[in-house]
């Protein structure tokens, strides 16, 4: 009997633009303070593209992809499919997956864009696992890339959101391996609840109104992201423990089997509350939000790469990837590193 196909992480990479914006820097543009931001979010700094712009999500994604490909030992031509997650595409269309494909020097490799915002890696990893186990593709490159800084309201009016976000990209090379060992993607659980779409959204530009962007929209700030922070917090502390238990059940594991939790890096208080609800020690929570802020689709793959680099996880580690974001969407993936 042939061995089952598993999806393993072959290589990871992350990239941030060189420009660092500290909490103190933000006080030049808005009424805030380093202490206020740290206490509410855990963020100390974030990376933004140059003030003059000219850098897109696919550009950041290219740099992260190069690192991941190198660590995987792949050439770009080894990629069977590109999955690109973002809420901040370079242009309205086509999506950054196709732009990245061209920048990698590829000609006809399929490219798929997903718009799951903060849960893009979870949805992308579950999709890639299904593709790989079906035999359709053997090697898949997932990239999450974001340029938030160009569309933030960097003023006192927008401070509740503007202080949160950073520009970045994370990449993961996923490969099919035939093995009886309980490794790779062990289980996934995905959910959405569209009735809460309006608590975390960016309304304009839009195709449902004419014109798609107007002076009135700009005056009202509808071209900036908006968030009902308390509502997002409430949903997160409820849904994250639920989906964690669901994916553990699917994988026939218990909370005690988790070596490390790598969550979406949205807010330190959310993640600490989630760990407490599961009865997990904070030492099993990986966090780098203090250095990068919320990087949305890049967040979890960046944190995975960072955790591997710091040797917080490695061969044999059982990891819970988990997050909640706009949509609302939320999900979790149980993963065990080979070895």
Question: Regions from the language model: what does each represent?
Answer:
Residues 43-47, 78-83, 102-115, 151-157, ...:
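Glycine/charged-rich beta-loop-alpha catalytic/anionic-binding loops adjacent to active sites
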Residues 10, 85, 115, 140-146, ...:
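Short beta-strand segments
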Residues 1-53, 156-234, 238, 242, ...:
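Condensing-enzyme catalytic core mediating Claisen C-C bond formation in acyl metabolism
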Residues 71-107:
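Anion-binding (especially nucleotide phosphate/pyrophosphate-binding) glycine-rich loop
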Residues 58, 62-65, 69, 88-89, ...:
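Claisen-condensing/thiolase-fold acyl-transfer catalytic domains that form or cleave C-C bonds
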Residues 133-168:
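Flexible, glycine-rich active-site loops centered on histidine and acidic residues
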Residues 30-39, 91-105, 142-151, 211-217, ...:
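Acidic-glycine-rich active-site phosphate/pyrophosphate-binding loop
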Residues 77-85, 255-264:
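Short glycine-rich phosphate-binding loop at a beta-alpha junction
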């Amino acid at each position: 009997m042939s061995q089952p196909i598993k999806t393993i992480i072959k290589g990871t990479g992350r990239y941030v633009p060189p420009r660092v914006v500290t909490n103190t820097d933000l006080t030049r543009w808005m009424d805030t303070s380093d202490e206020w931001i740290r206490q509410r979010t855990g963020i100390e700094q974030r990376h933004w593209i140059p003030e003059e712009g000219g850098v897109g999500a696919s550009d950041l994604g290219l740099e992260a992809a190069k690192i991941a490909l190198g660590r995987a030992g792949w050439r770009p031509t080894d990629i069977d499919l590109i999955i690109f997650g973002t809420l901040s595409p370079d242009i309205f269309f086509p999506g950054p997956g196709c732009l990245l494909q061209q920048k990698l020097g590829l000609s006809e490799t399929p490219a798929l864009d997903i718009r799951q915002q903060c849960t893009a890696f979870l949805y992308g990893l579950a999709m890639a696992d299904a593709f790989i186990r079906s035999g359709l593709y053997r090697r898949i490159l997932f990239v999450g890339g974001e340029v938030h800084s160009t569309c933030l309201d960097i003023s006192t009016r927008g401070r509740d959101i503007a202080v949160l976000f950073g520009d970045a990209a994370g990449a993961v090379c996923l490969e099919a391996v035939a093995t009886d060992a309980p490794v790779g993607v062990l289980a996934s659980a995905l959910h959405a609840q569209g009735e809460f779409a309006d608590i975390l959204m960016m309304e304009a530009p839009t195709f449902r109104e004419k014109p798609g962007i107007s002076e009135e929209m700009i005056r009202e700030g509808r071209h900036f992201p908006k968030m009902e922070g308390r509502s997002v917090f409430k949903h997160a502390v409820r849904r994250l423990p639920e989906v964690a238990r669901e994916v553990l059940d699917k994988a026939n594991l218990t909370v005690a089997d988790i070596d490390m939790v790598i969550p979406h890096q949205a807010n330190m208080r959310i993640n600490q509350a989630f760990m407490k609800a599961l009865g997990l020690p904070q030492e099993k929570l990986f966090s780098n939000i203090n250095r990068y802020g919320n990087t949305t689709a890049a967040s979890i793959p960046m944190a995975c790469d960072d955790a591997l680099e710091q040797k917080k996880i490695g061969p044999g580690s059982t990891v819970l990837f988990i997050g909640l974001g706009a949509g609302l969407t939320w999900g979790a993936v149980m993963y065990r590193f080979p070895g």
